[in-house]
């Protein structure tokens, strides 16, 4: 402990206080300790201290020190206010959150620092600004609450979409749910267990722990009731979901906090139950390259192939359909029905008419949140006019299209109101003025007239002053810094009248003001300020009037999105020559001449030749295919195309095949590819076994399972034994539809011993020492492995290839001499009988507590003798 060194009578030195402005800053920063605070000062947003150091590093802006506060230099960095959106985009991409602190007080009347407050908090999961959002991807905020009974509750929403989702799941299903939701930002209870928190941290999104009191189920119910303006959640079947209600409490509280206001446009609620959706685990989404390639790129993927939508709303709807197919066939059947109707020619006309439509969904959210920009309102007006002209489709027998076209009707009077209030080409921001239409408000028109007449007055004054003073090059001008002035060059200063008052001295001229010009300046500048204030007030009044249109605009947005997505699927089905799947009740996957849609498209783009189509038939009696054949022969492509066709059909799309019959499906599981997870200290083989274990626990008779080269991450015998055991489990226990590709030729015996399995192979032809891949799936096992031929094709040196051929011949000769054969698929041997052995009896007779050292040694020799005899 430090001793007091003050002398008697000496007063302690007090720390210097913060300046008034920094006192204000620290008070605001205390409310947002984990968030970068952008503090508005004039034409800049400033960041201070640790925030400044962080922003300087992330944004590559200059870090400096200015003045002192509390006896210490003020570390700071800044950005121009007009460049805010660009810097926000960078920070959001890095997972940061930013509190925007604006000047809300009047600078002219402020005593001390002008009043400031945080008007919004921009976070990765609560974005509403179109400049910060991807057209094709939702920004989703997710709250997760760990329950007490091995369950967790989830609540999520896209602030721009306006619908809350609730779900319960078992802890073991959490990764699948997280992959399905794909949140941009995740909230969890600070009291969550370390293991639970670690599972959440694996998500590549911003994650933050929130106080435990925010996860309150009763508060969540109240917030949901208030948000939806209802007295009960019964109509949504959302009662009794305590963990999800707790998550909803944190979700809504956080969303309102970041927006700085209520969310009036959020009026939808959907309870998503585990058994309603076809399960697509993270490995399936990754291996099938639904929205990202294995390299993390956006193209070529299934979504990039399908997405010919003309609007961002349509693209987002299509992606949502693709990632959340339902087990219930009603939704898929209704989409198929609509697509079939649109294929008749209507899709081409509608796609042309939809082109250029604005993002009504996001503009509507920004209207509700009072953040909408003037030019967005002009874009909305044009879209409303387009919607009125959309060509109706004969949808009398198509309920989905009937609903869509009913909702496509623009709200009455909305377009007219926007046209009446907003200029055709307004300024980008209301703060700049030049937004409100002429003739709307007499007071604004009068103030604008004063500004308009300004040029005429200045020209007239200049002519008069030239005549009065005899200064031919005299100029009457204006700038924002010094206001109005009369400029006289150095050579004419002797002619300046006595009533001129010097305003500014330049190198080659002087600037003056006269009483007449000063009077006009006061009037003109006052008119400008008053006109801007009037425009802002009128704009707020317009936003008030637009609130009543929000529900209808939300319906219109959903209708445009659905129609656009359906038209895109109709166009794809025609352009790519796809067929309509047929849904049946009996268990089956029957595909005629199926193709991998993405590979086929890439071959067409690159001139790589025609794609080789293949049939696939899996039924209740024949559920498993054992697939053999050379690497590069097309096994993985065939397996993936079957899964993609099943997925597309389940979404309600046409499929790349000549025919398709599909029974009920509850999940698509894949075990494909190999890579170490170094960050989590998991080897290739461990990851392989983890994925296999998850599949074996989850697969049912309604699941489609793809197993590609299981067991290759360990020794040959280990791998072969494991592959045989996994195949037997999938056949006997899970009874799932299974495509089982293997490089173990021994597994071709599996079909002979299991009635529900069949052998197929990808064909290839050898010509001398060369190999030609035919890519056809044919009945029966492969006649041989072509690994050495593939190695030669890959460019392995000839010496290595020749050595491998000789070694292979020797190994095959050695194998043919072995007489014993192991039955890989026999039932496990029974455990040995539990009767006591001689060793057991001897051990039972020994009491170690009473043995002398010599007796203990004798007993040990006796046990060793018994063990040798056994």
Curated annotation (Swiss-Prot):
One of its GO terms (biological process) is mismatch repair. ATP binds at residues 629-636. It comes from the Bacteria. Coiled coil: none annotated. The keyword NAD does not apply. GO terms for cellular component: cytosol. This protein is involved in the repair of mismatches in DNA. It is possible that it carries out the mismatch recognition step. This protein has a weak ATPase activity. This is DNA mismatch repair protein MutS.
């Amino acid at each position: 402990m430090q001793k007091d060194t003050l002398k008697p009578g000496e007063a302690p030195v007090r720390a210097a206080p913060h300046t008034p402005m920094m006192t204000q800053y620290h008070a605001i920063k205390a409310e947002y300790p984990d968030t970068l605070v952008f503090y508005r000062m004039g034409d800049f947003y400033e960041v201070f201290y640790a925030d400044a150091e962080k922003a300087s590093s992330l944004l590559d802006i200059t870090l400096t020190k200015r003045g002192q506060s509390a006896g210490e230099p003020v570390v700071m960095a800044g950005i121009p206010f007009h460049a805010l959106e660009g810097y926000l985009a960078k920070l959001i991409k890095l997972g940061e959150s930013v509190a925007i602190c604006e000047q809300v007080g009047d600078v002219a009347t402020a005593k001390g620092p002008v009043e400031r407050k945080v008007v919004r908090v921009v976070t990765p999961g609560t974005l509403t600004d179109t400049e910060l959002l991807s057209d094709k991807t939702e920004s989703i905020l997710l709250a997760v609450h760990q329950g007490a009974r091995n369950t967790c509750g989830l609540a999520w929403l896209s602030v721009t979409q306006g619908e809350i989702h609730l779900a319960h799941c078992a802890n073991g299903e959490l990764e699948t749910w997280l992959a399905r939701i794909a949140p941009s930002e995740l909230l969890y209870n600070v009291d969550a267990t370390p293991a639970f928190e670690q599972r959440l941290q694996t998500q590549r999104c911003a994650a933050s722990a929130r106080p435990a009191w925010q996860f309150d189920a009763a508060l969540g119910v109240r917030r949901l009731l208030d948000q939806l303006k209802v007295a009960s959640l019964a109509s949504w079947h959302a009662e009794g979901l305590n963990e999800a209600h707790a998550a909803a409490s944190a979700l809504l509280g956080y969303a309102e906090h970041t927006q700085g206001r209520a969310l009036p446009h959020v009026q939808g609620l959907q309870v998503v139950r585990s058994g309603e959706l076809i399960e697509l685990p993270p490995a399936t989404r990754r291996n099938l390259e639904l929205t990202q390639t294995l390299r993390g790129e956006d193209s070529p993927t299934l979504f990039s192939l399908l997405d010919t939508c003309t609007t961002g709303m349509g693209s987002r709807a299509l992606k949502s359909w693709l990632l959340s197919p339902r087990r219930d066939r009603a939704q898929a059947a209704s989409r198929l029905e609509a697509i079939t109707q649109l294929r008749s020619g209507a899709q081409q006309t509608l796609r042309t008419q939809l082109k250029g439509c604005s993002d009504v969904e996001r503009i509507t959210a920004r209207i509700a949140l009072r953040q909408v920009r003037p030019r967005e309102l002009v874009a909305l007006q044009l879209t409303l006019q387009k919607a009125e002209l959309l060509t109706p489709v004969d949808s009398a027998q198509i309920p989905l299209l009937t609903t869509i076209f009913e909702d496509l009707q623009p709200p009455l009077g909305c377009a007219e109101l926007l046209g009446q209030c907003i200029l055709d080409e307004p300024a980008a921001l209301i703060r700049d003025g030049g937004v409100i239409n002429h003739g709307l408000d007499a007071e604004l028109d009068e103030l604008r007239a004063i500004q308009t007449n300004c040029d005429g007055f200045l020209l007239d004054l200049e002519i008069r002053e030239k005549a009065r003073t005899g200064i031919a090059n005299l100029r009457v001008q204006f700038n924002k810094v010094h206001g109005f002035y009369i400029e006289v060059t150095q050579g004419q200063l002797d002619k300046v009248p006595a009533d001129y008052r010097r305003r500014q001295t330049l190198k080659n001229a002087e600037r003056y003001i006269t009483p007449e010009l000063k009077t006009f300046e006061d009037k003109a500048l006052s008119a400008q300020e008053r006109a801007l204030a009037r425009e802002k007030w009128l704009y707020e009044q317009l936003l008030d009037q637009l609130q009543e249109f929000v529900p209808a605009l939300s319906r219109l947005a959903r209708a445009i999105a659905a129609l656009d997505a359906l038209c895109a699927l109709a166009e794809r089905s025609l352009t790519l020559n796809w067929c309509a799947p047929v849904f049946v009740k009996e268990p089956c996957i029957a595909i005629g001449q199926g193709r991998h849609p993405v590979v086929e498209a890439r071959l067409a783009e690159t001139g790589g030749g025609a794609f080789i189509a293949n049939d696939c038939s899996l039924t209740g009696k024949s559920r498993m295919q054992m697939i053999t054949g050379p690497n590069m022969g097309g096994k993985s492509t065939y397996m993936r195309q079957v899964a993609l066709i099943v997925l597309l059909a389940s979404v309600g799309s046409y499929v790349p095949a000549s025919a398709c019959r599909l029974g009920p499906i509850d999940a698509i599981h894949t075990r494909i590819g190999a890579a170490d997870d170094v960050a989590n200290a998991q080897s290739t083989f461990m990851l392989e076994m983890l994925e296999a274990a998850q599949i074996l626990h989850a697969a049912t008779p309604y699941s489609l399972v793809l197993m590609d080269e299981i067991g290759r991450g360990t020794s040959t015998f280990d791998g072969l034994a494991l592959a045989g055991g996994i195949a037997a489990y999938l056949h006997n226990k899970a009874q799932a539809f299974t495509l089982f590709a293997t490089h173990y030729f021994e597994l071709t015996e599996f079909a002979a011993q299991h009635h529900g399995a069949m052998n197929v192979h990808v064909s290839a032809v050898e010509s001398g020492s060369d190999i030609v891949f035919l890519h056809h799936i044919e009945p029966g096992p492969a006649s041989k492995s072509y690994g050495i031929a593939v190695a030669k094709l890959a460019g392995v040196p000839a010496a290595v290839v020749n050595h491998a051929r000789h070694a292979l011949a020797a190994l095959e000769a050695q194998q043919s001499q072995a007489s014993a054969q192991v039955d890989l698929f026999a039932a496990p041997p029974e455990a040995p009988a539990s009767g006591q052995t001689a060793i057991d009896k001897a051990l039972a007779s020994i009491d170690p507590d009473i043995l002398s050292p010599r007796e203990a040694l004798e007993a040990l020799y006796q046990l060793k003798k018994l063990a040798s005899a056994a």
